[in-house]
Amino acid sequence: STSNRYDDTAMWKLPTTASYQPMNAVLALEAMKRLVKEPTASWRKILETTSWKGRMEEALPGIVLDGAHNMPAVRALAKSIRMQEKFRSPDGKLIVLFSAVKEKDYHEMIRFVCREIPADLIVVTKIPDERGVNPGELQKDFAQWTDSRVVVKDTVKEACSYVTACKREQDQVYCFGSLYLVGEMETLLREAARC
């Protein structure tokens, strides 16, 4: 969670590790102050219990879903991951699960990810939509920019099964690149948690 001082009144807590959410919360509070004309302190409890689906959302312990699907969002995600790195176990691995749609600049996203996110393992897959990039193409792009192992899984379900099977307690998985991927993963992980 993130703590920050706001409005010279108190410490505000957000239940997120996303580096970009404190600014989003401040913007929301300022809007509410002007639109609703209520003191910001009344919103404190609400913020402390707010969750943002698909935004640095820990869907299961050590498995984070983030809707980063363009360069600004991937940059913000990378910043959040780097901030969390100091808390990861020394023998823990960082696993990336990635997919993208054809009309996004996924080549640039992949170059950036390889340069800025210290992944030990990268799993690529295809979203269940004709706009999804072939995972073999994603693998080739990643292979140009990293020495980390890149594993191809043909479906999101196979990718989900793979990362949950190989993830150890001390490992951290970040799933991003497509909102479709995050939505599919959320459904699959919710079903897995019920079993």
Tell me what each language-model feature is:
Residues S1-S3, P22, V64, I110-Q172:
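C-terminal helical cap/extension that packs against the catalytic core
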Residues R88-G92, R168-Q170, Y174:
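Short helix-terminating capping/connector loops at secondary-structure junctions
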Residues D8-L121:
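Nucleotide phosphate-binding/pyrophosphate-handling subdomain across enzymes
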Residues R34-L35, Y162, C166, L188-A192:
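C-terminal alpha-helix
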Residues L27, E158, Y180-L181:
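Alpha-helix capping/helix-boundary segments
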Residues A76-A78, P90, M109-R111, P135-E137, ...:
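Short amphipathic alpha-helical segments
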Residues F98-V101, K126-I127, F176-L179:
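Glycine-rich beta-strand-to-loop/alpha-helix junction loops that act as flexible
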Residues S178-C195:
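Glycine/aspartate-rich loop-and-adjacent alpha/beta segment that forms the canonical ThDP
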